[in-house]
Amino acid sequence: MLKWNSLWCVDNVAADGHAPGEAAPMRTTLDEELMTLAITVAATARRRSAPNPWVGAVVVTSDGMQFEGATAPAGGPHAEVTALAAARAAGAELAGATLYSTLEPCSHHGRTPPCTDAILAAGVRRVVVGIEDPDPQVAGRGLVQLQRGGCDVEVGVCAEQIAEQLRPYLHHRTTGRPYVVLKLAATLDGRIAARDGSSQWITSPQARQRVHELRAESQAICTGAGTVRADDPELTVRHVDGSDPRRVVVGAAPANAKVHPCLEWDGPLEGLLDRLGAEGVLQLLVESGPRLAASFHRGGLVNRYVLHLAPAFAGGDAPGLFAGDGAGTISELWRGRVVSVCALGPDLEVVVER
């Protein structure tokens, strides 16, 4: 039986998460505990899996043994196959097992065979899925294939947490563009530098470490030519594990700039996002000065703002977060939704979404 309990549903599914005429599925505490474990496992693949989603899977055999798997780098096995392989390596009996996966298993041939084939071949009896995969090549087909193969399938356990974890992937697959994260660092009164232009460093080492984590989670990083000329940044990943993102400069970078090799872009930002999305960039991190930040912001192109605030004041006419004119009236204020607030050493990180 295919049971639906998610906002990510195929057609003909009621708003409360189950098919019309069908009783709402019963969710067990154990299901939520094991899906929470799968979410934790998925996080270990966050910096390595792109352009594939970072997925976690947990296999529970009929005698209670548990095995985990996360998405390997592109071209390697997906989370479900990795978890099944771990069970086999331990000599576990998979017939009648339950498999938990944060994302719908794929049912198509890509760089790897379909995960649904591996699940059915193993004799798994029940599959619990966090959310449906909006990728047009999947989009519910994996769930239907599992059901037709004899699996009991439930969708929607811990759906909100998983949708948050996979937000860049989901955005990319539904829009064709990367998820844009604008990182900003400022004093409490919103100043990004002193009057003389000096800005190193407003925030603490802990906040700067977080910036390197954001870089490691992104497949591309963007700045403006003005920032390159002023600061000559490398825009690489340091202090944390992860690969360097592809570097993008809006405008022309000096020939001897540390940011090379990079993509130099001289065109509409919308076109840049279209290109990067087509090339498999799931998340674009923007680290720039106030002019380029304002262009992304006022163009409605930012999906998430990550603001690092130091407990300091600059005052006066020191440079602010965005160049250009601000809101003329209170009614013109841009307002977002606070996702999280946390301490980074002496600083605050405030994450806001559109």
Regions found by a protein language model. Give the residues of each.
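Zn2+-dependent cytidine deaminase-like catalytic core
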Residues: 58-161, 246, 295-297
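Proteins enriched for Cys/Gly/acidic motifs involved in redox and nucleic-acid/cofactor modification
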Residues: 48, 76, 143, 157-185
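Active-site beta-strand termini and strand-to-loop segments that position acidic
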Residues: 61-62, 174-175, 353-354
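A structural motif shared across PLP-dependent enzymes of the aminotransferase-like
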Residues: 47-50, 54, 75-79
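Short, compositionally biased "basic patch" segments
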Residues: 58, 83, 87, 176-185, ...
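Enzymes that bind and transform nitrogen-containing heteroaromatic metabolites
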Residues: 4, 8, 12, 18, ...
